[in-house]
Amino acid sequence: PRPRPGPPTAAAQTLLCPPPLLGGGFGGKEDASVQHHAALLAYLLQKPVKVKLTRAESIAVHPKRHPMDMTFTLGCDNEGNILGVKARVIADTGAYASLGGPVLERACTHAAGPYHYENFEITGEAWYTNNPPAGAFRGFGVTQTCFAIETLLNRMAVKIGISPWEIRYKNAIRPGETLPNGQIVDESTGLVETLLAVREALEDARYAGIACAMKNAGVGVGLPDTGRVKLVVKESKLHILCAASCIGQGVGTVLVQIVAQETGLDRANIVLEAPNTFTSPDSGTTSGSRHTTVTGEAAHRACLLFNDFRKGRPLAELEGQEFYGEYLAKTDKLGADKPNPVSHVAYGYATHVCILGEDGRIQEMIAAHDVGRAINPKAAEGQIEGGVTMSCGYALTEQYPLEHCVPTARLGTVGLFRAAQVPPI
């Protein structure tokens, strides 16, 4: 029999891993599920190994959204101006932590919504339980606390006699104001504009609901968040090297767009190389809506170096030259001892209106988003439509029942929202 190899030595092991192009990210591919099993078996057996989960195993072990128990108290004056919010968020992270800590941080930094407050107190806890693991899937913890604060705003509007739109417009965060996490928002903040964009449709509808939301870009809260891109001239073409995994976000397309625009090169002369751990610089995880902002800026900086060196010369004269760009999205830790910490480098804002028909079914969804500068408008629209579709399933059809901590649902009964059910958006 072939002798079994011993454990890997302490010396660094160099591994070649060319990740394929995949879809279906949204936080569902952040956790190690079968990768480490396959790698260990392949090392011990010295043979190719494939590990494949059954559908039931996948439903049981892949992280879902965190179940959360949330207690919110909201106060306002007689005109509907919010005076303060107090919230306690308790998350069930399951039998393994996965990203329970970071998810709880996002849930808390977004818990009060995109509104201006004079006073706030927000605490969060994540607990190990015997339930299936929960992770960053679909919203990174933000959807849960968004539901809580938006529901409470509707109740408050009824109590003081103003419309759900008006209470949001009164309290919407505006440039120069401070979010509950202490961060001052800049002049690009566009929540008010999204509210104005949906007002007419909301008022014209007989049955309709409204909600606002905010979402961070980048990992934030003081964690390392660096984008890296290397440009290499090979065979009279400019090659883009970046280890960012393409799992449905369109990061490859965005990088090509940025490089084409910044260098003025025809796209036929730009090559996006597949991620490769031998040659591509590490650009961090594909998570937290970070790559367009963070890795895109790294590409922009590499282009500036390329342009400065090129000085109008043809690519053939630059053969073999390399240009490296790096960008650190620097943020402050939660609880940082400073007056106005920066929790995230950027935020997006949105207002949605759900219009119902006489039968109580969704007739139309209207989504107004402040996306900053849309590098790829079509892709941005697709992400918004995907988010709306997922939220419809989250609100209306999906369920994940457990019996003695074991899931009982099958793929056909978990209630995934079907394409035929998606309303006009």
Q: What role is predicted for each listed range?
A:
Residues 1-18:
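A conserved hydrophobic secondary-structure block that centers on an alpha-helix together
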Residues 17, 128-136, 177-178:
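Gly-rich Lys/Arg/Thr-decorated short loops/hinges at beta-loop-alpha junctions or inter-strand turns
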Residues 29-115, 151, 158-160, 164-262, ...:
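Cofactor-centric catalytic regions
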Residues 116-134, 273-276, 424-425:
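A glycine-rich, basic-preceded beta-loop-alpha segment at the flavin cofactor/substrate interface
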Residues 117, 133-145, 288:
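A short glycine-threonine-serine/GTX helix/turn-capping micro-motif
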Residues 130-138, 150-152, 292:
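Flexible glycine/proline-enriched surface loops and loop-helix/loop-strand junctions
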